[in-house]
Every structure is written in C-alpha cells, then in structure tokens.
Amino acid sequence: YGPLIVLEPGQKYDLEHDKTFVFSIGRYAPFGSMLIVNGTPEPDPVELKTGTIYRLRLINITTNESDLRVRLEGEGAPVQWKVIASDGADLPAALLKSSAADMGLTVGSTRDIEYESDREGHVEMKISAPGFEALIMQPFDIVFAK
C-alpha cells in the first residue's frame, strides 16, 4: 500500500511531518471484509511530538462502499484540526480554519489535515463505515518534544 503524492517543482516530501493513511477494505479470515489502514487491520501507533505541526494525508480507496467517517479524538472527544487540502488541491486561505476533528470521506477522495498537539497523551483516529459493525483505530502517542 502506498500513495502517489505529487509535489510542486522544488518541493520535497517531508518524511518526518507528513503522515499518510490509506483506508481500504481487506479480507481477513475469519472476519471477512473489514476496514484496514495502510494494509493492516491493526496499525501500529504513530509517535507525534508536542508543538509540532503534522500533515495527515487521508486517502479513501474503499471500493463500492459508503462514505467513511474519520474522527480524531483524545479523552473521548474530538480534538481540533484544520483541513488544508482536498483531492490534491490546497484550499484557499479563506477556508482554512480549525474545527472539531470529525468528517466524512467519500470513496476515492483525499483530505490533507494539519494537526498539532500542545500536550502529551494518546489520541486515536477512528475510521468507520455504515454497514460495518466494527471500526478501526489508528493510535497516536504524543510525546514531549525535546
């Protein structure tokens, strides 16, 4: 699993601050079809640092499925994030604003999210789809930036 990310001439991919998540449907016995993240039903935690801005690239490649619901939460409630790009195009400055981290993501679409935490702890990206009893969680461990 991996995306094709197109950058502007001279722009470099920032491996430390860009985190990509590809959502799809996998077949894992004995469960049948289930949501997976980056090719696995049990993704490893991603370590983030406090005070650091990250670009979370969300890509929905599920086929013939309903829209996904993506929610990033800490302590049971959505955290704040900022949608900065949609389907490969940066959003105009007038549309850039922080909001509760909860949105729909249609089949074949992408969203780039800006996320920064000011405190240590654990947050989870919860991905769900209508018709699937279970949801999948991508854990994040936020550590103090040294």
Located regions from the model:
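Copper-binding active sites and cupredoxin-like electron-transfer domains
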Residues: 1-146
